[in-house]
A protein has these predicted regions:
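Feature captures hydrophobic
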Residues: 1-183
Length: 183
């Protein structure tokens, strides 16, 4: 488990280090994807708003006011952010780039609420707004373990739904589009 400092350190140092490491082993075409931007709103005491922009082999932390229309806005509580940051998981922006999903992210329009059940029964939550649009919206519910398996390709999203590992409420078309992030 990583020892994480404040969110500012995570977004200005940890995520850029993850990006550099991800590119080191990646095919050249990973860095040739279009520019991708993300804003992170960490709510509650200790939180703040942070912005990242990736262009080619460069990742840049920006003052949040300089990123008016990010491709992806992620909203989560300070406690849920800290839990994620301490898990040694790769930041989702870096993961989407590494897996060549920039075009998929940029094509999404709507809001995805994610509710993951941890092994201790507590719920980890985040909201991702794609393309600056609140609607359509979908809520996904599953275990943290199953979500990780789905993102890694070990668990097919359709199979997760058919076996009851993935439950959703809201827009089926948006759910189908979001499924492309896990393929």
């Amino acid at each position: 488990m990583a020892d994480i400092s404040p969110p500012e350190v995570y977004f200005t140092q940890t995520v850029p280090e993850q990006y550099t490491a991800a590119l080191a082993d990646a095919p050249a075409n990973v860095a040739e994807q279009p520019e991708l931007s993300a804003a992170y709103e960490i709510t509650g005491p200790g939180g703040g708003t942070y912005a990242l922009r990736v262009a080619g082999a460069q990742i840049e932390a920006l003052p949040s006011e300089q990123l008016a229309n990010p491709d992806m806005r992620v909203i989560l509580s300070y406690d849920d952010w800290r839990s994620f940051a301490e898990s040694d998981a790769t930041d989702m922006l870096v993961d989407y780039i590494r897996r060549r999903k920039v075009g998929v992210v940029q094509g999404l329009k709507g809001t995805v609420h994610l509710e993951l059940t941890r092994s201790d029964g507590s719920i980890w939550q985040s909201t991702m707004i794609f393309g600056g649009q609140a609607e359509p919206a979908v809520t996904l519910r599953m275990t943290n373990e199953d979500y990780g398996a789905m993102l890694s390709g070990e668990l097919n999203g359709q199979m997760a739904f058919m076996t009851g590992k993935l439950k959703f409420e809201g827009s089926l078309p948006l759910l189908m589009q979001v499924g492309a992030l896990s393929s």
